[in-house]
Amino acid sequence: MATGDGIIAAPPSLESSSLDPLHVLPASSSTAARSLATSIPALTASFSVVSGFSSHLPPPPVTPPAPSTMVGWIGWIFSFIFQVIPSVLYWIVTFTTITLPTWLFTLFSMSLTFTMNFTTLLLIALAVVSTISWFIRYRFLNMYSRLPPEPQRKEPQLDLFPDVPDSDTKPGLANYLDEFLSAIKVFGYLERPVFHELTRTMQTRKLIAGETLLLEEEKGFCLVVDGLVQIFVKSMRDRKSGSDEELNRMAGESSDEDDHRPDGRQGYQLLTEVKNGASMSSLFSILSLFTEDVQLRYADSSASSASSIGPGLAIGPDSFPASPREMDDSPHVYQGDRLDPASHRNSTAEDLPAVPPLNLGESQVPPAHSARSESRKYSGKTRRKSVHPDIVARAMVDTTIAIIPASAFRRLTRVYPKATAHIVQVILTRLQRVTFATAHSYLGLNNEVLGIEKQMTKFTTYDLPNELRGSALDRLKDKFIKERDRLGQEEVTKGIALHNPYGGRRPRSSSFRRKEAALQAKMVASKRPVSMVAQDSALSDRENSGVSPGDLLSTIQLSRFGPRYEHLAPRLLSPLTEKEHSPLRSPSPMIPGRASPFHRKESLDEDALFRESILECIMKGIGLTGSTNDFLRKSSHPSGDVSPKLLSYDSRRQKAVFSNNAFGFIDPYEGSADGESESMMSMSVTSAGGTSPIVNLREELRNDIEIVYFPQGSVLVEQGERHPGLYYVVDGFLDVGIPVDDKEEDLVGSSRPAHEELFPMLRRTNTSSSRVSGSAAAANDPRRKKQSRRSLYLIKPGGIQGYVGAVASYRSYTDVVAKTDVYVGFLPRASLERIAERYPLALLTLAKRLTSLLPRLLLHIDFALEWVQVSAGQVIYHQGDESDAIYLALNGRLRSVHEGPNGKMTVVGEYGQGESVGELEVMTESTRPATLHAIRDTELAKFPRTLFNSLAQEHPGITIQVSKLIAQRMRDLVETPLAEKGGEPGVSGTVKTAKSTLNLRTVGILPVTAGVPVVEFGNRLLQALHQIGVTNGATSLNQAAILNHLGRHAFSKMGKLKLSQYLADLEEKYGMVLYIADTSVNSPWTQTCITQADCILLVGLAESTPSIGEYERFLLGMKTTARKELVLLHGERYCPPGLTRQWLKNRVWINGGHHHVQMAFRLTAEPSHPQTKRFGTVLKQRVQVIQAEIQKYTSRRIRQSPLYSAQTPFKGDFHRLARRLCGRSVGLVLGGGGARGIAQVGVIKALEEAGIPIDVIGGTSIGSFIGALYARDADVVPMYGRAKKFAGRMGSIWRFALDLTYPTVSYTTGHEFNRGIFKTFGDSQIEDFWLEFYCNTTNISRSRAEYHSSGYTWRYVRASMSLAGLIPPICDEGSMLLDGGYIDNLTVDHMKGLGADVIFAVDVGSIDDNTPQVYGDSLSGFWAVVNRWNPFSSCPNPPTLSEIQARLAYVSSIENLERAKNTPGCLYMRPPIDPYGTLDFAKFDEIYQLGYAYGKNYLEKLKREGSLPLPEETEEKKKLQRTLAPRRASI
């Protein structure tokens, strides 16, 4: 061992082993094995050497022998077992028992000493604390920065589907048929036999280019099949000149719009151009074809008649002094050469006496009819004018026209009366929608339209009999006077209805009465002798001839009706019948000893007599008794002398007219819902038991007639309201007028003050557009003081008010007010609809009267207006096309889309029912600025430019009216904020959303997947719509209702046509229609719900899987462009964070937003049949109930029930959704102002307590924070708690001191500010908020404002609250966002764009010091500091550098604030918070109480002024339905 160099020599054994381990290891191993095999002591002796060696080396390997023999292998295995395994065991034992304890003893016996100073210890401590704080700061306290990225949801791209191929691309016969079918669509749906009857006599005619056609000589329905025809009208200034010269000259000249004579006088003017598939006839000319043989007025020769106009009398020009037309030469007025409609058709011409007709009481009819007829053939000057005079057609190219002659319409009227009545009803409806609505609401032709109603009173005035005047009327008035004294003035103005003892009985259905009558007839026939049956059959033959309500008791045996009618026999006697002493009337043999009821007053019920008499006059007025009464008198005496008055004779055609016309009697069969076949018309007109159908009608109407009293000044009908029914004036006067503004508007209109038009939903809207507010308040409403009425005419006793509107289901163009105390008989609209459906003569009479009273101006407008029907997705015109017409939406919805230079589609606007589009381009003769396409199947009125030019020359007032409309639209465009016109992504959705929320008429409710309770959802939504007061009401449709209406046509092509017309009528009748898709996904009704909807609500269960459902796939396959919104149903008022994003992530087609609705529902439908209760089933159900109860208490979910809620039902989720669909949402806009925004919490609480619902919330800066708190839960209590907690954090100086950093970008890092907002909102997203919410920010990277309505709440609220210099901007998709108040601190414009109707704007911003500065042209900073501290200085302090920067930043915000204050519908609120600073968060309670007190005072002030938009005012409007539910007098 050499120790000098520190090297220790190893033992020989170890040294040799280390030198040659390969030879030493096997030897030592074999020696150890042999020693172990011989004796244990030898193993103990060599323990120390082996342990030292084995502790450093692993177990030695064993080299296997050469595989020569099997014995060698076996030996090697035994050697391995006895050598290696013991060595390993020995190593483990020695290490754990000796080596390891030795190491531990050595370690613990060692001592270490560290010596360091305080500086080192301090540095080490700081390092440790810094490491821990860094770990906590960046690992635990910044969880907001590690949230998964959730970018804002992008607006879906607009899809324009390819155009529907035009029909003119089809070859040959298909093109011809398509053009013809498109032209006769104006008739509505036609059944196959009706279609064949109409077209079997159709003729075609070829016109060469330049050939003219006098339409006034064409007696038929003309349509263009192929070619182009121009329609000309003779100028009014040149009407009296001859027309032959004009026609000859016009045929050879070019197609200018105006032709001029050499002397400068005008000739013919171009009205319109008719292309393929369009009609050359107007709606009025079609009506004239159907009503040639209909009388204008029922003949009443008694003294009580209000007019002497009879069916055989001509109406001269002096009969209608206000008529714009000459009535004496109109074929529809002149009745002298027509036969009485009641003449029997079975009689032949030879049976008739060859005598000319006599006219009793008038001499205005020319005596020579044949001479007049002959002269008409040869003299153009003396020929009778048609319904379309001075109308000439000229073919521009070789044209093929089709003509359906007038004889086809006459035969159709005779063979298919119910189909004729339906066609007339369809045309009357379209006449109102197309011609009347356009002339009244769009062109301002009030005098022409309202003059028709005024002149109509000439036909409908019939006085009550004299016996009901005097003392009888006085006794009736006494009953009302007693009740009026008992009631208050407010109740009396709604009307007092006389008690009707039979009014409460529910009338039985017509089918039930028919079955009952048939059964009773069989029973009577089986019991009576043959002679009685023969007598009844003879009577039945007489009744088949015709029945008049005035002759009921003279032809009907009362005993057949049972004891009740025998008891009521005196009361059923018609007073009008008794007072007519006609020599043709004989006493009825059925009622022996009948005497006049007026001589036995003690046995009469005068109320019933009044009702019978009023009903008699009303039925005469609507034309139900004219032909039938005369016909009954004639047929009752076949052997007697026939009065010439009762039998007219046509000397030209040598045959009797109306000999067996279907309208000569009243059709007995009610138009059932399943559409009964017209073949049933050939059956007997009487019921099976011999009962005339008119008796059933009289019984029904007698129960429906109400006698109502209205005091002076009461409003019976309001402008824009659908007529509640017919008012027959018994005593008093009704004043018919229109509301006019006292202050005339200029060309661009005058905007009302902000408080004038606060809540448009509280006022009825005009039928032309939902944006034009009507007046629906009571006469004493303080908000109507700015309007006055202009009286048009008076309705005197005996007159009928509402005839045109009630029979044809029009809306009223006028107000009807009681001029004096008035007593009226009221027949509800439902009864009139029943009459019109069962008795076609009422509609035909109305159509006849309308055609006779039509002004020439309306005729020309009706001729030129084209009724157009387009399919869903069809493009009406493209961008860049020539503007040739103005389009008015009658039904459906249109969307205007502008294509930018980069191909991006931008929605310009959407247009609903009653709105127009294209005036500006037509007036300026420019090209179309955008593409217009139909969102769904749409009906349009096409107003050609040629008609506008023609009207502008002859009626300048029309030009002024349209100019006002265009000027108003231009004003709206000028006043629209520039931000809303831009194409930036953050602002582009404003205009689109605003246009799409207005004037929605149809809403489709579609489930996401099967099992969603859409029926219950639709019913609750409908109930909410009724409660908020939708204009004209709302209704819902499901498959059951549609099948009930269609009946046997439900699954045929006819059913589709019938359904389309039915749906169009419903949309016209109601303000909103809900289509509930309650069928399977592939059913036709589901497809109908999608195609008919302006807006589609996709309803899904929030707790179910958010995958795409089968109904959504079907919706996407339909390629509809309607607006789509998602509705999530929650069982509780709670939405888990991120749930809404999962639903919206895969639904890029949702372009209308989403809604959260709480609704309790059953996941499984109740079984229709109760299941048998077995023991196993009962036990299983009981276990499930117990398990559910346990989970209720053990679940960790916190039940989100509102802790505070105002006592108002209008804050419900369904009411919020209903207001959104109606465009009546209430918005709340909160401005920025730092700690001053705490006052907004108090204002919101005041709004809650006042019961004002809030639907949409928008905020800026601190307003975004407060608004997000309220929108999250829609509750005041959690908002108050979280806001106070956040204010406590912001009031801590130490938190900001610890967050300070080097002011390169800002003074603080923003971490503490981020944590304060994140601790308030967590990971919730804006989509999960219960109320719709948005906040605005300023994008300094792109220099624009952005509005955020999706994404993490804390990020965008933090960005909206980021003051420049204090907090760094927040990064969002590469852009830097700062406080939104720099551009717009009060976002009223954006809220208005979202569809909010009433907006509460709370401004808490600071007010700048506007003191004039006079410090000169230069300024010393030292002088400014001294002046600031000098109390004796008179110079104002100049602003500091920071104040100048702040004012510079808020320059644009001040302009937007001033515009927001003047926005219509905006209620501007500014609490007195000026003494408080931006960072005074420590004064939370003080500022909160100040805002609460201000809010209560402000709302109370609005309530006193009548300007508070409370839903209760809508309920008051419902009470104006005066006669629908009148107050009964206790008599």
Swiss-Prot record:
Residues passing through the membrane, by range: 73-93, 116-136
Composition bias, Low complexity: 768-779
Residues annotated as domain PNPLA: 1228-1392
A Pfam family that the UniProt record links to this protein: NTE_Ploop
Membrane topology: Multi-pass membrane protein
Stretch forming the signal peptide: none
Compositional bias per record (Basic and acidic residues), positions renumbered to this chain: 325-343
EC number, UniProt record: 3.1.1.5
Top-level taxon in the UniProt lineage: Eukaryota
Keywords attached to this entry: Endoplasmic reticulum, Hydrolase, Lipid degradation, Lipid metabolism, Membrane, Repeat, Transmembrane, Transmembrane helix
Annotated compartments: Endoplasmic reticulum membrane
Main location: endoplasmic reticulum
GO cellular component, one term: endoplasmic reticulum membrane
Region (Disordered): 242-265, 303-385, 766-789, 1510-1531
Positions on the Lumenal side per record topology: 94-115
Protein residues bound to a nucleoside 3',5'-cyclic phosphate 2: 849-969
Principal EC category: hydrolase
A Gene Ontology BP annotation from the UniProt entry: phosphatidylcholine catabolic process
Motif extent (DGA/G): 1379-1381
Spans within the Cytoplasmic topological domain: 1-72, 137-1531
Record GO terms (molecular function): lysophospholipase activity
Keyword Cytoplasm among record annotations: no
PANTHER family: NEUROPATHY TARGET ESTERASE SWS, NEUROPATHY TARGET ESTERASE/SWISS CHEESE D.MELANOGASTER
Its biological purpose: Intracellular phospholipase B that catalyzes the double deacylation of phosphatidylcholine (PC) to glycerophosphocholine (GroPCho). Plays an important role in membrane lipid homeostasis. Responsible for the rapid PC turnover in response to inositol, elevated temperatures, or when choline is present in the growth medium.
Protein's UniProt name: Lysophospholipase nte1
Record organism: Aspergillus niger (strain ATCC MYA-4892 / CBS 513.88 / FGSC A1513)
Name of encoding gene: nte1
